[in-house]
């Protein structure tokens, strides 16, 4: 990890300042050049949140239905919760995904986001919710039959660009 760009940022933990934490993740992921990482900021329960996931690796409908809508629909008593307890409060009372846990380390958040999970960062909270939202193309990258290549790679892609990128992410 020493020769990786932003390795020092990966060793850090969430600060609880939503703007600073999202900017750190944007730097680690190389935004705006890396357009596959989605940052979806929104307000719910009287505080600010941001969902972060990899397009093509996470099911966007699952993110919308079980995370964004669930947080918007559940405002009852959320403003009375202490900032540090917001993640646990949402985990127990709002999020409808059973495979969810709290995480505070950037390295683990980045690893899981790239693997298809969604991180929910919450303003004032040093823990993020990490939720199972994986869903991607399931075929293996295969050799082409119709095009024989003498030198070089022989893997073939016939789907959309987004699907092909997702297949390569899983392959690597």
How should these model regions be labeled?
Residues 1-172:
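Membrane-embedded alpha-helical signal segments
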């Amino acid at each position: 990890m020493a020769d990786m760009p932003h390795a020092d940022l990966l060793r850090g933990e969430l600060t609880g300042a939503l703007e600073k934490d999202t900017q750190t993740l944007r730097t680690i992921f190389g935004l705006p050049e890396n357009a596959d990482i989605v940052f979806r900021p929104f307000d719910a329960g009287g505080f600010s949140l941001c969902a972060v996931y990899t397009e093509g690796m996470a099911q966007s409908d699952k993110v919308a239905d079980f995370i964004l809508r669930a947080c918007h629909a559940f405002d009852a008593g959320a403003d009375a919760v202490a900032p540090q307890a917001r993640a646990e409060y949402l985990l127990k009372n709002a999020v409808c995904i059973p495979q969810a846990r709290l995480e505070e380390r950037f390295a683990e958040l980045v690893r899981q986001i790239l693997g298809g999970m969604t991180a929910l960062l919450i303003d004032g909270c040093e823990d993020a919710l990490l939720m199972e939202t994986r869903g991607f193309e399931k075929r293996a990258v295969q050799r082409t039959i119709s095009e024989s290549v003498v030198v070089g790679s022989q893997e073939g892609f016939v789907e959309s660009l987004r699907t092909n990128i997702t297949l390569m992410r899983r392959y690597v």
